[in-house]
Amino acid sequence: MKEGLRVILSGGGTGGHIYPAIAIADEIKRRYPNAEILFVGAQDRMEMEKVPQAGYEIKGLWISGIDRSFSLKNFIFPFKLMSSLSKSRKIIKKFKPDIVIGTGGFGSGPLLRIAISKGIPTLIQEQNSLPGVTNRILSKNASIICAAYEKVKDVFPAEKTIITGNPVRQDLLKVDQLREEALEYFQLSKDKKTVLVLGGSLGARRINRLIENDLKKFKDEGVQLVWQIGKLYFDEYRKYDSATVRAKEFINRMDLAYAAADVIISRAGAGSVSELCVVGKPVLFIPSPNVAENHQAKNAMAVTEHDAALMITEDELTERFEPCFFSLLQDERRMNRFAANIKKLALPNATSDIVDEVEKLINNKV
């Protein structure tokens, strides 16, 4: 590997695209402490805050997705795209990267397109079981694709698609050793079951309403909650914070949140699914319906088809949530079976395997 490695990572919009990119950057830095790493994301999105918190520089592009319903915002999309392509060209010219890595999200498309046009090695990290339109287009000319699901080879060029799994935070590999610390951190009772509720980094309105409506039921069942409400809804629901309901806008110590949990209620974003497989706890997935091509439901089904989790769609929640979820809480054998089966789906070395592919690409270039 050459001295002075220079890497651009691009991805964002949601935590599911940001945290894999940060995990890859951390592994590159671990192997090559002198590496220069630059992030590129969508301006005004959460990556502009989360990436600097992780210790990396980031530049923003004026870019967003296309609204799938009719919207006036779509009329300015071509101007955003042209602006982002122009800025991406300038960023690449100035930074001179050895490789460009895209983890999905609005910002990665323009940057990868310019990198490909200039013959710079490119790696796409596809988290979902159903790839988005941008990655489908870019995959034809990208150097390599690292994916989490075997079925994406039906969409991507199979000869350059490698199944590595999704990058996960390395601190999640030891959550089974952190139970006592986790209960103390969240000030929870060791004598009650703990349910962790995750609605994604921004929050999930339907999940928050569900939990609000069932707070008495949780209390009656002797269950305590760690409830990640999300940035968009925290002011509305923070009033429920109590000794048995730990209401949080955002959870910085996810390793401890997972360690405290007996059962987890979660969206089914690709990054979350990968983390939950590594953690190995029983899960109820409530996929977001507000995503392209219903990919969260497909991510969840890739787990449930192995008898490794439950899934309830938002349309089914009113009828099915209480009987399904609370019967699971009382069924230790089923909880243990789900935990064992979901753990079998984990690919805990994904981050390392992806950086191995980065090294191969750069070594082939030199």
Swiss-Prot record:
Subcellular location per the Swiss-Prot or TrEMBL entry: Cell inner membrane
EC code: 2.4.1.227
Database matches in InterPro entries: GlcNAc_MurG, Glyco_trans_28_C, GlycoTrans_28_N
One example GO MF annotation: UDP-N-acetyl-D-glucosamine:N-acetylmuramoyl-L-alanyl-D-glutamyl-meso-2,6-diaminopimelyl-D-alanyl-D-alanine-diphosphoundecaprenol 4-beta-N-acetylglucosaminlytransferase activity
Entry keywords, A to Z: Cell cycle, Cell division, Cell inner membrane, Cell membrane, Cell shape, Cell wall biogenesis/degradation, Glycosyltransferase, Membrane, Peptidoglycan synthesis, Transferase
SUPFAM superfamilies in alphabetical order: UDP-Glycosyltransferase/glycogen phosphorylase (SSF53756)
Domain of life where this protein originates: Bacteria
Pfam families: Glyco_tran_28_C, Glyco_transf_28
Enzyme class: transferase
Membrane topology: Peripheral membrane protein
UniProt: UDP-N-acetyl-alpha-D-glucosamine binding residues: 14-16, 128, 169, 201, 251, 296
Pathway annotation from the record: Cell wall biogenesis; peptidoglycan biosynthesis
PANTHER family according to UniProt: GLYCOSYLTRANSFERASE, UDP-N-ACETYLGLUCOSAMINE--N-ACETYLMURAMYL-(PENTAPEPTIDE) PYROPHOSPHORYL-UNDECAPRENOL N-ACETYLGLUCOSAMINE TRANSFERASE 1
Function, as annotated: Cell wall formation. Catalyzes the transfer of a GlcNAc subunit on undecaprenyl-pyrophosphoryl-MurNAc-pentapeptide (lipid intermediate I) to form undecaprenyl-pyrophosphoryl-MurNAc-(pentapeptide)GlcNAc (lipid intermediate II).
UniProt family annotation: Belongs to the glycosyltransferase 28 family. MurG subfamily.
Protein name: UDP-N-acetylglucosamine--N-acetylmuramyl-(pentapeptide) pyrophosphoryl-undecaprenol N-acetylglucosamine transferase
Protein species of origin: Christiangramia forsetii (strain DSM 17595 / CGMCC 1.15422 / KT0803)
Gene that encodes it: murG
